[in-house]
Amino acid sequence: MNDDILAALSEGKVIDITTTGRKTGEPRRKEIVFHNIGGRIYISGVPRERKRDWLVNLEADPHFVFHLKGDVVADLPATARVIDDPDERRQVLAIAEKWGWDDLEDGVRHSPLVEVTIDD
């Protein structure tokens, strides 16, 4: 991985992800924000009771494409690890207070949260 890509991954920004549709097997592209917290890459979202389609797709097939866009453009094969453990979710999402979230426990219960590994 080149230095520009490493630099882009070191700070959160808007990206696209392409997952595989769990029912259709077709590629599904979605704009989303990633975060680098302590050197680890996460994708999360605002709390909602209903699971997002992209998350359900990643639960069915954790392999996806992480598309950097903007100043650095790259299509990176990646693997998602859906984080379900409440204690781990709480630890990661504690940073959300800096994003203006009022209710951490609502985030722990209802926010999508995946850790991303960029594949070699």
Which positions does each model-derived feature cover?
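Short low-complexity stretches enriched in small and charged residues
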Residues: 1, 30-38, 67-75
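A generic structural micro-feature
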Residues: 9, 24-26, 58, 108
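Extreme N-terminal tail/first-helix region
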Residues: 1-14
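Short, structured beta-strand-loop surface elements
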Residues: 48-120
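Short beta-strand segments
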Residues: 12-47
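Short helix-to-loop capping/linker segments positioned immediately adjacent to catalytic or ligand/cofactor-binding
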Residues: 4, 19-24, 101-105
